[in-house]
């Protein structure tokens, strides 16, 4: 099995786009890329825009040759109705989606999911609602958790976690569980016993606003439990990489992993690259170059459509 992170915060954008290849299947998870509309009360910097444009091209190119596309929920850094990533990527693909009607918040149920489904209408070879189901595709098993909360607050909606297995190993893609602040977030991982997990990490950059201290502490404890679950590799990237001090936040997880011989890494480091932290350094970027960014029309429309 081969795992290739395509776009993540440690690669310079908001995304969790990941390519997973088994012996007989190529699966693309959450093919979307976005930026923070505002951070430190600043719009995206030109370096962020350029990086998004670069990775969008990579993502579209990767999508041409995949068999399966998975959409874990309907936030714009996980799905795209055509703002940045053209919906033609879904042509002739088997597409697994989060249930657009059940266990979903109102903004996704009544606006984002319907718009997305209209945008890809008649393009996939088949669309399957995936929540809580298991599918055999060739010699590959793709399992989905029941919908679990998007972090500690159900008002942000629900996501489905994904386990992809071949005869050799299993990888879990947690989607946006925000570092597992609820015990229900752990159930799927304990059932599937993966060798590799891709997890987003807590919203520590919003501590004191959206995230409570006790929720952060619970997320870290639960991530420690995940590391103890027989894993070989943990890729922690997405929400927590929006915090410039992410390594300090994750130190207890790193320490336990080191004791157990588990590799913990960002998506960039997994690819043997230095993390390219842009959003968390936006103030610094504007101090270096204060010119307003040139936004492509699609990206401008995406950013005006709202965060998440």
Swiss-Prot record:
InterPro entries (UniProt xref): Metallo-B-lactamas, RibonucZ/Hydroxyglut_hydro, UPF0173_UPF0282_UlaG_hydrolase, UPF0282_hydrls
Source superkingdom: Archaea
Pfam families named in the record: Lactamase_B_2
Similarity remark: Belongs to the UPF0282 family.
Name of the protein in its database record: UPF0282 protein M1425_2116
